[in-house]
Design a protein with these regions (language model features):
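Boundary/linker segments flanking structured domains
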Residues: 1-46, 51-145
Length: 145
């Protein structure tokens, strides 16, 4: 069996969704983002997204009707892939797919029941990851035949 490749994602401090588009990281960063809501002392992950452009550009087009259906504070975390150093759109897609499959957010339509990926990865979520698991091993997603 080939050796797994390591991906490290550094998650930003959570920011209010409405103000997140104006943060410095939203202008510079790209990768994965996590939209959650906090209510009654609990946090619920609602959506995982990706962008190979700036976070800000993606969030500007992301105001979803469903967000107004939730009480409480809507927050976003930005996940910057710090390892490997060179990040491709294929890696970003594989990371998004693995996270969606692993946590099954309510408002993601695809990749919740299965997905394909380019390489065999193990993901390490670091920083302010909130409810995101610390480690996601893609090998655990493979259904035995």
């Amino acid at each position: 069996m080939p050796k797994q490749k390591t991906i490290t994602i550094k998650w930003s401090y959570p920011r209010e969704f409405e103000n997140a588009k104006e943060t410095e990281l939203s202008y510079e960063g790209y990768g994965i983002y996590c939209i959650s809501r906090k209510f009654g002392g609990n946090e619920t992950i609602l959506y995982i997204g990706k962008t190979d452009k700036r976070f800000r550009d993606r969030l500007k087009n992301h105001k979803k009707d469903w967000m107004s259906n939730y009480r409480g504070e809507k927050i976003v975390r930005f996940g910057t892939i710090t390892k490997p150093v060179t990040v491709t759109s294929t890696i970003i897609n594989d990371v998004e797919s693995a996270i969606i499959y692993d946590i099954d957010p309510k408002h993601n339509k695809s990749k919740r029941k299965g997905y394909s990926y380019f390489e065999d990865y193990i993901l390490y979520n670091q920083g302010y990851r909130g409810k995101l698991p610390k480690i996601i091993d893609i090998r655990n997603h493979i259904n035995p035949v």
